[in-house]
A protein has these predicted regions:
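Catalytic-core regions of core metabolic enzymes
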Residues: 1-298
Length: 298
């Protein structure tokens, strides 16, 4: 079992006819992801990568039974693409697009909130690397060869640090059940808490690697949730220990603007909740290996 995507999940790509969308769709197909079609307005009736292209998401869902969508749509139009997917009945959308205006994402969040829980679409991103369940499929832009199938979940705001964690663990013989990049924007679809809850309920995940960074309250909120609800061990790493206050560091959401948003404060909050924090990025895999060995010996 995996969370969010399995080998059977039927996937469409919004923006499949564009250069970037086509490149990553081809990568997903080679890996074995069940890509059943794509959507590009005005290109309906054509084919890309031997998959049918539709004018609208609703047409694609009705024709293919698609349940998940990967959104490769330029920032000015990405919010409308996400809302179109939700309205068409897509269950999970992963948005890779960077630079979506915060006001547009606020509109998306309000739009998604109107749906009842049994019909609400799960949004991962934007500005994220995507989701991969090794050996089954992926929705995103990550290099799939660095992931080995296993029983540790990864969730992080930084895509490249997620790659690094997976690579380090693979070198130590530790595999991944599912890796989720939630994105680095200040307003995103799924939080650490949302993904941690999925991993907690997943019988094929034994532990979780959580990768945070400066800015925002998500890590502190996740720490409280882990303390009160999580039965599986969580290892964390927080990027930005040397980041100055008030300066954006890479991601739009990576800026220290309030108490509790610096890396050091987040490390203290996570540690107080019983989470093991890796001291630097090169020790993420070793820290997870140590936690797993202690759990096995208990």
């Amino acid at each position: 079992m995996a969370i969010i995507i399995t080998k059977q999940t039927p996937v469409i790509v919004q923006g499949i006819s564009g250069r970037i969308g086509q490149f990553h769709a081809a990568d997903m197909i080679r890996y074995g992801t069940n890509v059943v079609g794509g959507v590009t307005p005005g290109k309906g009736g054509s084919q890309v990568l031997d998959r049918p292209v539709f004018n609208t998401v609703r047409e694609a869902v009705e024709a293919t039974g698609a349940e998940a969508s990967l959104v490769f749509v330029p920032p000015p139009f990405a919010a409308d693409a996400i809302m179109e997917a939700a309205d068409a009945g897509i269950r999970t959308a992963v948005c890779v697009t960077d630079g979506i205006p915060s006001q547009d994402m606020m509109k998306v969040k309000r739009f998604l909130r109107r749906y009842p829980e049994d019909r609400k679409m799960r949004l991962v991103g934007p500005n994220c690397a995507g989701v991969i369940s090794p050996g089954q499929g992926f929705l995103g832009i990550m290099p799939p060869h660095i992931y080995m199938a296993g029983r540790v979940g990864i969730v992080g705001r930084s895509g490249t640090l997620g790659y690094e964690a997976a690579s380090q663990m693979k070198a130590l013989g530790i595999g991944v059940s599912t890796s989720v990049g939630i994105g680095g924007d200040p307003i995103n679809g799924s939080s650490f808490k949302d993904i941690l809850a999925l991993f907690e309920a997943d019988p094929d995940t034994d532990a979780v690697m959580m990768i945070g960074e400066i800015g925002g309250p998500q890590e502190a909120e996740a720490a409280a949730w882990v303390r009160d609800h999580m039965t599986k061990p969580v290892v964390a790493y927080i990027a930005g220990l040397s980041a100055p206050k008030g300066r954006k560091m890479g991601h739009a959401g990576a800026i220290i603007s309030a108490f509790g948003e610096s890396a050091q404060e987040k490390v203290e909050i996570l540690s107080a909740a019983g989470i093991t924090v890796a001291p630097n990025p090169s020790s993420m895999g070793e820290t997870m290996a140590r936690v797993l060995s202690l759990r096995a010996a208990a």
